[in-house]
Amino acid sequence: MLDYQDPWVGAWGETVGGGPGGRPDLKSRLSRALALRLEPMVVRAADAITAVSSATYEQLHDRYPWLAERPCADIPLGGEPADFDALRRQLRSNRWFDPKDGQVHLCYVGTLLPLGFETLRAVLEAAARLGIRRPDLYARLRLHFFGTSNATTPGAPWRVLPVARALGVADRVTEMPGRLDYLDALTVQTQASAILLMGSSERHYTASKLYPALLSERPLLAVYHEASSVVDVLRGTAASPTARVVTYGDADRAGARVEAIYDELAALVENPRYDPAAVNWESLREWSAGALAGKLAALLDRVGVATRAGEA
């Protein structure tokens, strides 16, 4: 069983990388070359493949047509309602911001990937426009970014603040690049005025915090590639203004959508309203821990039956 969480072969090392200006460098090129060599060997040896979205493993089908007969399942990173119930029964302290101070705390929780900087820049440019056009709303806004480096060790590098400084909005931004533990992340999400969800320039991208964000019962501002599975999920589970969704595409990039992001951001800061009636709770059941575990178990059963049949 291969859990193909992130594509091994993509834009990294080809058009983007760890070099100056986000361009490919020697390390990213070598990483891509190694992935191109190892990937076919690994997927050929796998009896089944799981991924967070069907678009992720469909890339493998495009590269290796013979893989189409291999059992595959899309198993997104879901959320468990019981975790939120337990958290609300036993509140944890919030040492990062005061949810009752009258400010609008818009919180992002999760790693900021290299291909996500274009989206980040568009969001911060929208915040800069808010400062120019609606200084009253800008003064109320607080943008918090948690776990952006995905590192748990002290001294994790800043990823958001340098961009915020360059765009002149650092006075509204705080960043805690170190990764939060699970319950702290849920605490931030449940106590935020609203939750910010940002995607990547890659079509397949899906957010690991999407379902916890929906279960947090807070308004959402989501900025994603139009082909991301996140867009379909949000539009099928939560209506505006509870979930405000701005999309971009391959031609109409995130930078071209700053005005649309500004409109939604301004409306959100002016009235960060959450309406539980706007959420299709029944549709969220299929992304609970129990439902996703059942989906994985069904795939394992399928592999087991095929293996036994092959041994007979």
Question: Model segments located where?
Answer:
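Acceptor-binding helix/loop patch of EC 2.4 sugar-transfer enzymes
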Residues: 1-36
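Nucleotide-sugar donor-binding and catalytic loop/hinge architecture
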Residues: 85-105, 133-136, 269-272, 302
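Nucleotide-activated donor-binding/catalytic signature segment of Leloir-type glycosyltransferases, i.e.
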Residues: 140, 144-149, 154-179
